[in-house]
């Protein structure tokens, strides 16, 4: 499944998918990293990563943009707010309960819904 198939999964412009697992980030972006989040909307995909990886990511990622991430609850939340996202699907099978709980609280009032289809 490529990024375009993730975009097809979304029902509308006010939905997004967040990919946080290392193996799925690498699969979708072509870039190996130990930290980062891939956010996919109907219109675009953005790989948020920290300062250790940003330069290499900007040169390497495929099918998406790379942006610097300093604090998850700020940059990604701002990205979500700017695009009026109200629902985010997250991985269900590939993340820990603590990461899932963190995403649910970090992006309030946006609803984060784990999906086993991802």
What are the roles of these predicted feature ranges?
Residues 56-63:
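A short, polar/proline- and glycine-enriched secondary-structure boundary/capping micro-motif
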């Amino acid at each position: 499944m490529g990024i375009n198939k993730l975009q097809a999964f979304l029902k509308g412009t006010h939905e997004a998918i967040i990919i946080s697992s290392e193996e799925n980030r690498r699969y979708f972006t072509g870039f190996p990293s130990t930290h980062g989040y891939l956010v996919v909307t109907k219109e675009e995909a953005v790989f948020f990563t920290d300062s250790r990886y940003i330069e290499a990511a900007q040169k390497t990622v495929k099918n998406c943009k790379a942006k610097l991430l300093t604090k998850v609850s700020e940059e990604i939340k701002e990205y979500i707010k700017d695009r009026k996202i109200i629902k985010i699907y997250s991985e269900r099978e590939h993340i820990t309960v603590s990461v899932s709980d963190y995403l649910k609280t970090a992006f309030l009032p946006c609803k984060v819904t784990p999906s086993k289809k991802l």
